């Protein structure tokens, strides 16, 4: 046992340690245990920090090297399954932030660009090394896939089939990322695509990827769109919209969709209707984001669309995230010159924490197909 472990520091009588020991025991996790999901604590202040600051304290203390865990994904699966995050006291700053989110619009047109600059503009080198050739930063579809490349291409194919794309159609890709879906649809289905993103780095790479194809990549807020499209798709973008803007979002989609068109929404979802913001994720990964619930989507779309199909592939996100993590680890020697060790710990924590939450089925991934007035005879969607 390392001399930095808590047994050697003789603080087991500390009240913070006792509380943490009891709580972790509910998830079957031991402090300085020998199993992959047990934690190794390096700083005795860890317990107080986490119990006082909750999720933010847990994540920041890991970034600071206060604790280690061989399999963070397994640790978080157990923590989430046991509901431990609900037992932690709310940090005052978290409470105030949630209250502010209910009162203010954190995804106004001005604020919407923050996530583009703080996350998606981290650098194309990072995402190029971590993602598949289509650079899909969203859940793959692993039904018949054995590799990340196969899973992401299967996802793209399924989306295009659900939208029933035909040559000559116009497709709007809201939150087009690095242009993978836009390029795939244009090349394989003969459609004309307009993609929008709020990330300058994404636009740059997407334009290069789509060179020679009937694809236009715009750097703008989706709310400024005033065109007509046969089909609209939005993958991994609705998580950034927030409840105050959900109705506006569906207003924009309705305004830009042809009367007999189809719209596919691909989004991470929460099991409960709340502000659904993790303080650590909000600070370090996706500022001003919020996960929608079934109720959020149903209420926001009511009066705009008929819901034709709802498909949950959330279990596949666990495997996608772990594939990203393996690639991130392999690529780290190439990335280390540009990014700090603290960044490496932050990004590893993010990928594994999310994988554990999906594995515990606390998070979902939904693909929802809408039509303006209902498709006569209904539609049979791809699976």
Give the residues covered by each predicted segment.
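Conserved SAM-binding loop of SAM-dependent methyltransferases across substrates and taxa
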Residues: 178-189
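A short acidic, Gly/Pro-enriched loop at the edge of an enzyme's catalytic core
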Residues: 223-232
